[in-house]
From Swiss-Prot:
Gene Ontology CC: one annotated term: cytosol
PROSITE patterns assigned: G_TR_1 (PS00301), G_TR_2 (PS51722)
Biological role stated in the UniProt entry: Catalyzes the GTP-dependent ribosomal translocation step during translation elongation. During this step, the ribosome changes from the pre-translocational (PRE) to the post-translocational (POST) state as the newly formed A-site-bound peptidyl-tRNA and P-site-bound deacylated tRNA move to the P and E sites, respectively. Catalyzes the coordinated movement of the two tRNA molecules, the mRNA and conformational changes in the ribosome.
Principal location: cytoplasm
Keywords: Cytoplasm, Elongation factor, GTP-binding, Nucleotide-binding, Protein biosynthesis
Compartments in which it is found: Cytoplasm
Ligand binding (GTP): 28-35, 94-98, 148-151
Name this polypeptide is given: Elongation factor 2
Gene this protein is translated from: fusA
Residues where Diphthamide is found: H597
């Protein structure tokens, strides 16, 4: 029997012992060494050969990942590890660190109970480290820390024990500050989740040279830091690897400090599921009952050239097996499971069944998308997975060959299914399709994959930035009349408080939650009681309030009112860009008593026009997306680096020394950051490393508004002059 077959059999045996299971993700900033570390763990578990670990990048299975040397998709793998005389099953997800692929990280966190955060010893905690930590903590996932590339401190920077200790203590302090800040507000975490060397929740080492240490491992092997420095300086890295192998240190830490599903699910279920806490389904999920109803959350959709579409996700209760007919949230009817498997590196191994507490890879769930709830009974779905950043950049994609058009449309729909952070707009009439993503690299990778994997040659347009529109002050009351003049709506618009907008973005307030809970949350964020109890609907980050009293026929017309409102908010009055952060109030309405005279053709335009006019009266402005920029650069290039930010309508917020480099931090509009990578390289002779992170939207400068609005209107084929405001006042 082959070694791999043996591992699969052992995994199958351990799947039924939830106490022995650990579901974990490895997450970090780009290039801090996650994938190299993952390869080491696979080698330690006997999944790939020890010699090639670190070069193999077994988890980077796509051609573009190996070419670019970064992880783009989150990859899954199951392996076994013996700890304290007991074998453990470790289901691991390696996630991307590049900011453009943060959606994969968010989804991975839903499937796991522990996150191993990897930080580069030389660079320290970076912007994306903070983002992945925040995503983990928000999903109720417990962190531990591995500080990688310690070999560089010893060999390159020639640091002695004191300097090293100071630097490493600094990294641990930064990470703990983030953990403390996030967990203080969490009622369901009653233990201290900060990491420390003494507890064994921090490990150090070098993924490249395959050695690692932690407090427990030093006690076990009798090695101390002084000896490690000696061996590393004397280039005896093989001896270091043999005496204190990285995979043992990290996997021991995983088994000791991360919760198993039995401990984790009772705490995590209330955080990610808002159904009836006393129901049988709730009990089965909290007890990880493999005999209960099946409940699985899909976190990832992938394509296998042989098996077709594969839905991977966490089984919270019940057991999934071939032939089951399962409900998929948000769709009618059921899907039949064709096959069930687990991941071993890039390969999927078919197994008979996967019980609660494990990560399964299933075919046959044709209606599932990343984020779907799959279950054997109809039930309240899981909370939607909140992605920290929204799409900010758009490209048009056309098939070079008209014959490829149907295949291109199908491929784009598939892309949107696999990666919910991508938005696709398909225009059947023009054949031009818009695809919006997190950044230039995100869209570049998607279009390359369409060409390479599907063999469809495409033309792509220049990148276009996504804008928003938002009211700046309270409007006067505006009347909206239906075309037949028999129906009137009286509406005002005002800006919504920033705290409330943020709460909606984070998913802490939605129309899916019980009304009382929603009202309390809104009042906590500063909304007054009367307004909070009259919320009719929430659309994106806009709230619609029904302040009317006893208006005849309004109840049966409300659905059309909401439809008109949503149309107005999806295409704002300035440039048909989405409106955000608006509080819309309906004060009064006059409706025709005969239903035939207050149908969709009358109500929808009346409301749409009233909302647009109220927005114009509320001084609506264009918002543009911005990015936080961090550039690390040698001293002599500091001026060039800050010049690159300032020359892009940006602002430099801070400059400071870190090690032998200067750090320049600032913000700049995404629109101006297109093409930044090649410019910064030439400005600093290739000596800079940099990072950008999407930081939401801000009001665009007044002097740039008219020109930008004209450009967008022209691009969309709209009339150049803005709609005139009807004079009601």
């Amino acid at each position: 029997m082959g070694r791999r077959k043996k591992i699969v059999q052992e995994c199958e045996r351990l799947m039924d012992e939830p106490e022995q299971i650990r579901n974990i993700a490895i997450a970090a900033h780009v290039d801090h060494g996650k994938t190299t570390l993952t390869d080491n763990l696979l080698a330690g578990a006997g999944m790939i050969s020890d010699e090639t670990a670190g070069e193999q990048l077994a988890m980077d299975t796509e051609e573009d990942e190996q070419e670019r040397g970064i992880t783009i998709d989150a990859a899954n793998v199951s392996m076994t590890h013996e700890y304290e005389d007991e074998n453990h099953l470790i289901n691991l997800i390696d996630t991307p660190g590049h900011v453009d692929f943060g959606g994969d990280v968010t989804r991975a966190m839903r499937a796991v109970d522990g996150a191993l955060v990897v930080v580069d010893a030389v660079e320290g905690a970076m912007p994306q480290t903070e983002t992945v930590l925040r995503q983990a903590l928000r999903e109720g996932v417990k962190p531990t820390l591995f500080i990688n590339k310690v070999d560089r401190l010893i060999s390159e920077l020639q640091e002695g024990p004191e300097e090293m200790q100071q630097r490493l203590t600094g990294v641990i302090g930064d990470v703990n500050e983030l953990i403390r800040g996030m967990t203080e507000e969490m009622d369901d975490i009653n233990e201290d989740w900060t990491v420390s060397v003494e507890d064994g929740t921090v490990g150090f080492g070098s993924a490249l040279y395959k050695w690692g240490v932690s407090m427990p491992s030093m006690q076990r092997t009798g090695m101390d830091f002084g000896e490690i420095i000696e061996l590393e300086r004397a280039d005896k890295r093989q001896e270091l690897h043999e005496r204190t192998p990285l995979s043992d240190v990290v996997l021991d830490m995983v088994c000791e400090h991360f919760p198993n599903p039995v401990d984790a699910q009772p705490r995590r279920i209330p955080r990610i599921w808002r159904g009836d806490a006393d129901s049988e389904v709730a009990e089965a999920m909290e007890l990880v009952n493999e005999d209960g109803e099946l409940v699985m959350m899909v976190t990832d959709i992938g394509i296998d050239p042989h098996a077709g579409e594969i839905a991977a996700g966490r089984v919270f209760s019940g057991t999934i097996e071939k032939g089951q007919d399962l409900y998929v949230s948000g769709t009618a009817g059921t899907n039949r499971v064709q096959s069930v498997g687990i991941y071993m590196g890039g390969e999927r191994e078919e197994v008979e069944r996967v019980p609660a507490g494990n990560i399964a890879a299933v075919t046959g769930l044709k209606d599932a998308i990343a984020g779907s709830t799959v279950s054997s009974v109809e039930m309240t779905p899981f909370e939607s997975i909140e992605h920290i950043s929204e799409p900010v950049i758009t490209k048009s994609v056309e098939a070079k060959n008209m014959d490829d058009l149907p295949k291109l449309i199908e491929t784009l729909q598939q892309v949107a299914k696999e990666d919910p952070t991508i938005q696709i707009e398909i225009n059947e009439d023009t054949g031009e399709h818009l695809i919006s993503g997190q950044g230039e690299l995100h869209l570049e990778v998607i279009t390359q994959r369409i060409e390479r994997n599907q063999g469809i040659p495409v033309n792509t347009g220049e990148p276009i930035v996504v804008f928003r529109e938002a009211p700046q002050q309270e409007s006067r009351e505006v009347e909206g009349r239906s075309p037949n003049n028999h129906n009137r709506f009286y509406i005002t618009v005002e800006p919504l408080e920033d705290d409330i907008v943020e709460t909606i973005k984070m998913g802490d307030v939605s129309m899916d939650m019980p009304e009382l809970e929603r009202r309390e949350e809104l009042m906590e964020q500063g909304m007054d009681k009367d307004t909070a109890q009259n919320v009719e609907t929430i659309h994106n980050t806009n709230v619609f309030i029904d302040d009317t009293k006893g208006i005849q026929h309004l109840n049966e017309t409300m659905e059309l009112v909401v439809e008109g409102l949503e149309e107005a908010l999806n295409d704002g009055p300035l440039a048909a860009e989405p409106v955000e952060g608006a509080l819309i109030r309906l004060h009064d309405a006059r409706l025709h008593e005969d239903a035939i005279h207050r149908g969709p053709a009358q109500v929808i335009p009346a409301v749409r026009e009233a909302v647009h006019n109220a927005l114009i009266d509320a001084e609506i402005k264009l918002l543009e997306p911005i990015q936080e920029v961090r550039i690390d650069v040698p001293n002599e290039h500091m001026g060039a680096a800050s010049g690159e930010i300032q020359g892009r309508r940006g602002r430099v917020d801070d400059m400071y020394q870190e090690g032998d480099l200067m750090v320049v931090e600032g913000v700049a509009p995404v629109d101006e950051m297109i093409g930044f990578s090649s410019d910064i390289r030439s400005a600093t002779e290739g000596r800079a490393s940099w990072n950008t992170e999407n930081a939401g939207f801000r009001v665009m400068a007044d002097n740039l508004q008219p020109e930008t609005i004209d450009e967008i209107r022209e691009r969309k084929g709209m009339k150049l002059e803005l709609p005139e405001q009807i004079d009601y006042f």
